[in-house]
Amino acid sequence: MAAPNLITPLRDICVKVVAANFEGCPTFGPLPDKYVKRIIDILPLDLPLELVGSLIADEDYWRRRSQARWKNCEVAAHGYSWKQLFFERNLMEFLEQYDPAVTDLSSLKRLLTYSRRFVQTVHIRQLPSHLDLQILFECMVNTPSSLALSYNLKEVGMDYDRSLFGMKLSDCRALAKALEHTETLTHLDLSNNSLDDDKVRMLASGLVENLSITHLNLSHNKIADRGVRALAKLLDGHSVISLLELHDNQIHTEGAESLARAFKSNQCLLSVNLRLNRMGDEGCKAVVESVRGSPTLQRLNISANAAGPGTAAAVVALLRLNNTLTELDVSCNQFGEDACGNVRRALEQNGSVRLMDVRMTGINPDDEMAIAENLRARQERVDKARVLGK
């Protein structure tokens, strides 16, 4: 029977001493990896970020630190990295709570500067300070790659004031200037920001000089025809935007026709979402006809736009002539039973579409069931081919 170890080994004492004094002496020296790991496992979780950010890459440390601060941590939304999660959420909270009357601007700039190496996505749910976003891009050189920004206000209660919500024209002007120079931002989400035509035109002045943004989300705003005309100019032959989301706005026929003219020369768009607008039959028809010969477009959504038989005829031609489109949503329109029958027959001749929504278009149950069975059989063939590696 082995004698009990009554004396703590010197190496264990050293590990504890190094961990306890890490803030004053932030180095691991030439220690073997197994001792470095033991030190990190007992490091305090309140060490300054500027200190541990560059020295500690161990994911277990950042997991413990994240879970100690927040109850719900979805690491998948942060590149499956606990370190990235911590820095992104820490920056998000600081920006959302930033008050220039209380916190010095230099503190914000310092946080942005030392966080930039570990941050890919900036997601801001409220920005009551209406901070000049040029500061963010100037400090975070070469980052972020994704910006989701919402000018809402949480927990307002009885102090509710409609003017506190949404982007101001000055916010759009500052962001437009920043967008002219950023070269790493690929995803811009400005949904639900009360953007109207004047604000979108201001943003477009910066977007026209931008060659990095590939995913643009301006949904759930108040963009009408004048604003859409400005956006259409961004979608020329030199555009790099591949995902365009304009659903739930106020786009009418004229705006739809402006987009249609731009779509004809565009060689980059992969997905366009225009649902919940007011394009009408003529506007939807123009959009569908414009993408008939597109060599790139894979997803198109024009649901809930008061489209009629004219659009249905354009959809029939699209299905017969286009072989790149894989998803099409025309639900909640007014095609009529006869037009929907033509759509069903055209789909049978099409070999590329795998998802198609024709609900609430006046289609009879037999045609709707036939379309569903057709698409289900196609998907089964695709799944089988994927399993077999074909």
From Swiss-Prot:
Transmembrane segments: none annotated. LRR repeats lie at residues 182-205, 210-233, 238-261. Belongs to the DRC5 family. It comes from Chlamydomonas reinhardtii (Chlamydomonas smithii). Its main location: other. One of its GO terms (cellular component) is cytoplasm. Keywords: Cell projection, Cilium, Cytoplasm, Cytoskeleton, Flagellum, Leucine-rich repeat, Repeat. This is Dynein regulatory complex subunit 5. Component of the nexin-dynein regulatory complex (N-DRC) a key regulator of ciliary/flagellar motility which maintains the alignment and integrity of the distal axoneme and regulates microtubule sliding in motile axonemes. May play a role in the assembly of N-DRC. Pfam families: LRR_6 (PF13516). Component of the nexin-dynein regulatory complex (N-DRC). Interacts with DRC1, DRC2, DRC3, DRC4, DRC7 and DRC11. The keyword Cytoplasm applies. It is found in: Cell projection, Cilium, Flagellum; Cytoplasm, Cytoskeleton, Flagellum axoneme.
